Amino acid sequence: MASGAPDGKWKVVKKGKKSGEKGGGRKALSESNVTPGGTAPIKMANTVYEMGFEQILKKQNKEQVPPNNIPAEQPQKKQQQQQNPGRKKPQSGDTGSRQRKFHTLEEGLKALDLAELQRELEKSQNMFPESPSIWVKDLAGYLNYKLQTVKNDVLIQQSHDYPYCLVNKELKGIVRSLLAKAPHVLDVMVDHCIFSMFQELDKPTGESLHGYRICLQAVLLDKPKTVTNNLPKYLELLRSQVNRPMKCLAVMWAVGQAGFTDLSEGLKVWLGLMFPVLGVKTLTPYAILYLDRLLLAHSNLTKGFGMIGPKDFFPLLDFAFMPNNSLTSSQQENLRNLYPRLKVLAFGATPESTLHTYFPSFLSRVTPSCPAEMRKELINSLTDCLNKDPLSFSVWRQLYTKHLSQSSFLLQHLVETWDSNSKAMRKSVRETVHSFKVTNGEFSGKGSSLKDLEACDAACQALLHKMKGSGFPWRRLIVIAFVFLFGFVFYDVRTHNSFQASTSHKVLQQSGLLSVSQQAWSKVSNYSLQGQSWLERNVPQYYSQAVEVLGPVLEQVWAKTQEGAAYACEKGSVLITYTKDNLPRLIEWLHSHTPDSVCQFIEYLRELLLHLHRTYLLPAVTYLEAAVQNAWQQYVASCNGKVTWDCVRGQVSNISHSSWTYLQNTTMTVTNWALSIISHH
């Protein structure tokens, strides 16, 4: 059996030789397999040692022991075969000892003998009870040896959980059971799988890597911290293999599996391992693809709040929007599509207390040479900072003199969007603009940035003008008019000692308003008196009848309601207790008895819905919005640019007339067609 050592190399455990045996030291395994000429091939025993690790042991023993002459080993080989007839090996040239390759991984998984796997794992545990690292290495080697396919699958073209999604529950249970027995050597297993993948990638025609990948996913989907606690080690490994893209992609894929069950761990992996190599031509596509899959797998971004700070966010912003960087245009476009979700992650759950820390970096990037798309994004982000975090205004006032050109762009944007700003923001902008006006007066005629200062001053003037003329004060005008009218009437009545002798009474009487108001008041008074008298006569009678008829019923209803509420509370508490006790068992039972086909169907359905959402629903909504906007513009144009009630009435009349005419014509056409058919018969 292959045994693990503290240095991570393979060693061979062999039985001790008898004193009478003669040999020139320890022989390599490939040398001991050489049989005398004419000997028939020996059937290979079905053990993990002989099947899963024979090739690895041959290579390791050849490296550890220099080969001796073959003729000197043949007597010893015969003696070993006589002593251990059950441990015979086939000739090195025997093609029957090779594991056959399957056309697809699904075929290999269906053909896998789980009972044999269980026996080999038990044998490994019995032989090395104190070395769990050997158990997990045996598991990885056995699975990879048994799951060989004719063609290696391209992982970028597969789902993020491939190939583990193809594994049935029985095999998953065996793997998880063994991993649970060796929790302290999971990092050893991860490193073993990665370096075994490296060895296969070094070969011109290396074997498939499905077994190693399945073991990596089994570990990291359950214990992601196995790799996220050692990210610097894997980053160093990645940089050491930067000229070997396939090895780098193997490391990125392996470590990236830690992120699909926990968004925070996935962001750790991306920021610590993949972001540093963003821009490397051969690695950038997978880094962006992994980020896309990670954010797609976690629709709830709240678990990732706090993982991205200004130190990581602004380099991402530059990669997404700055031209002439190391990304291609399509890669930049993909990163820009992910940028809104990265922005949400960066701002976190409480943007009102964190956005002021992003404000300086946003402001410093709004330069005259900044691309238009990036400038638009920066200006919108600065506006969000000012609108959500009031501390951003104080930060802006401190940076104003050092960033005059950038401030002019932001001030001009505030002028253009003044009407859409909130009242709280308008108040803060007013105070800030007054502060800027004072600063502009102090720096006027000084320094070399006179042009930028003039642009800022002009924008401040425009903002002040907007503040003064933001709209006609109808409310104030109505209040003032009411107060003035009340004061005039009060003064008029006081001057003439009575309302009948006042000028106000004469004006109201001449205009007819007084008589109309008197008639209205008399009618209101009359109806009020009638209503009051009716209520006085009928309310006591109706109330007594209602109490007599509905009183017993309401009492019974109230009593039944109390009893029902008490019964519901009692049964509800019992049901809640029962659910708490049995829900985990139910979940476990469903998990163990649900067919894999159901899980695959749900996954396929999810992918289908996502495809429909992206391919059909979003374009349909966009088309509908454009159609509605176009229809509205045509309607406004038909009204000569002014939507009035007369225009609406005319449009409705035209539509009704057109519909009625069309209905009449259709009816006549159908009638004529029916009559012609009848007449022919």
Curated annotation (Swiss-Prot):
Q: Which residues cross the membrane?
A: 471-491, 608-628
What is the annotated localization of this protein? Answer: Endoplasmic reticulum membrane
Topology relative to the membrane: Multi-pass membrane protein
Instruction: Identify the glycosylated residues.
Output: 300, 324
User: What InterPro entries does UniProt report for this protein, alphabetically?
Assistant: ARM-type_fold, TMEM214
The record's Pfam families line, in alphabetical order, gives: TMEM214
Keyword line:
Apoptosis, Endoplasmic reticulum, Glycoprotein, Membrane, Transmembrane, Transmembrane helix
Query: May I have one GO cellular component term?
Result: cytoplasmic microtubule
Q: Where is this region: Disordered?
A: 1-41, 58-99
GO BP, sorted A to Z = apoptotic process
Provide the function of this protein.
Critical mediator, in cooperation with CASP4, of endoplasmic reticulum-stress induced apoptosis. Required or the activation of CASP4 following endoplasmic reticulum stress.
Assembly, in brief, is: Constitutively interacts with CASP4; required for the localization of procaspase 4 to the ER.
Q: Which family does it belong to?
A: Belongs to the TMEM214 family.
What's the protein here called?
Answer: Transmembrane protein 214-A
Organism source for this protein?
A: Xenopus laevis (African clawed frog)
Q: Upper taxonomic classification of the species? A: Eukaryota, Metazoa, Chordata, Craniata, Vertebrata
